[in-house]
Each structure stands twice: as C-alpha cells, then as structure tokens.
Amino acid sequence: MRYSAFSLLKNALNGNKDWKPAWRKPDPKPAYDVVIIGGGHGLATAYYLAKEHGIRNIAVVEKGWLGSGNIGRNTTAVRSNYLLTENQHFYEASMKLWETMSHDLNYNVMFSQRGVVNLAHNLPQLDVYVRRGNQMRLNGIDCELLNPKQLEKLIPGLDTSASARFPIIGGLMQRSAGTARHDAVVWAYARAADQLGVDIIENCEVTGFIKDGDKVTGVMTTRLDRKSTRL
C-alpha cells in the first residue's frame, strides 16, 4: 500500500481497518544471496542493494527489534559541516538523499532543515571554525561565520554577555543542516526494503560464521544457520 492523503482519509473513515503491517515478519529462508547483520544502517544497505542493483534475495538480521540499537539512540543531527574535504563530499551527498528521502521512501522521516550552529568559546576554537568554514565554501557547501550580535539575533535567549559562564565569541552556522526522527527513518527503510522483497529477521542474533576454508559461506544464528554468498 502506498501512503497518500487518500489512504489516510479512507482509513480515517473506516476506523483504520485496512492498514497493512509496514513490513512482513517472515520465517528465514534456508539460504540468501546476501545476509546483512544489523537492522540500523543495514536496512539502508539492503534497500539500495535491492533498488539500485536488483539484488532481492537479501536478509537483514537484527538481534533485537528494529531501532533498538544505535540508530535509535543518536543526536538526530544531519549535517555536512566537517573539516576534511573527503568527509564534506561524503556527507554532502548524504544531505541530498535526506532532502528527498520522505518522497523516495513514501514515509515521513520528519527531516527538518532548521540549521545547526557550532559555538566558539575561545580564539583557538574560533580559528578552527574559520578554517572549517573556508574549506566548506571552497567545496560549495553553505556556511556562515557569525559574531555574537548575529548569534543573539538568531537565537534569542542565548547569553552572549562577557559574564556568561562560557563566553561566546562567535559561531559557525550551516543553514541546510537539520534533524530527522530516527525511529521514522528506521521504519521508512524497513518498509521500503520489505516492499522490494528483503526479509527482515528480528530477534535473531548472529552467534558465529560458517566457513569453508578461508571463505565465509554463512552465519550461525539463534534461529538456525543460514547460507549466504555475501555478508
């Protein structure tokens, strides 16, 4: 089922009787082409393998429930304001994915580009932000170096006085950065991957690997062992 205004209205009128589970609870197959361990980043990996590369016989194995690991315990910040060029290009490409993710996955991940500000409390720290900001602009990434007056106008209530416990002498802002709801991201990728045929196996812990010489051919789990050509 594709989520839409029509489906919301239809289910609102019939007492929410027609909603289907966001993803299946399948029994594991005897073998898979790919087994991915971990239902956090693993869900995105499975989705793009299925969508971009046509690999559909995939299992994502999660020892708990989806979102119970690190993906459900993070700062929710989405940004590309890093110092190194390699990091900037990597995270800026990720930012572009975030901007269309809700549409691409047909699920509201609550991505909000409200901006992020890093505050400088001393001259060495401000110098680091100046260097980072210059590098960002060289790579075409938006950023602004702000003085205390500009910060005060941008963030009412921020204590920029000289008597503040942690005096603020400036800050670096990236307006395109923001936040996303991590639970919604997990559910969105799980639903989208499931619709492409990916099996999501929850409450299934990997306890070891099956090997043929130096080659890994499968995984041992708390729900039987599974063969795989790739891990």
Model-derived features with residue positions:
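Dinucleotide-binding Rossmann-like beta1-alpha1 core, especially the glycine-rich loop
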Residues: 75-157
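Short loop/edge segments at beta-strand edges and connector loops
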Residues: 62, 147, 202-204
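Short hydrophobic core segments
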Residues: 35-37, 61, 226-231
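Helical element adjacent to the flavin cofactor pocket in flavoenzyme catalytic cores
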Residues: 172-226, 230
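Extreme N-terminal leader/targeting segments of oxidoreductases
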Residues: 1-33, 48-56
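Glycine-rich FAD pyrophosphate-binding loop
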Residues: 50-72
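N-terminal Rossmann-fold NAD(P) dinucleotide-binding loop
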Residues: 42-43
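A short, glycine/Asx- and small/polar-enriched loop/turn
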Residues: 124, 154-168, 210-218
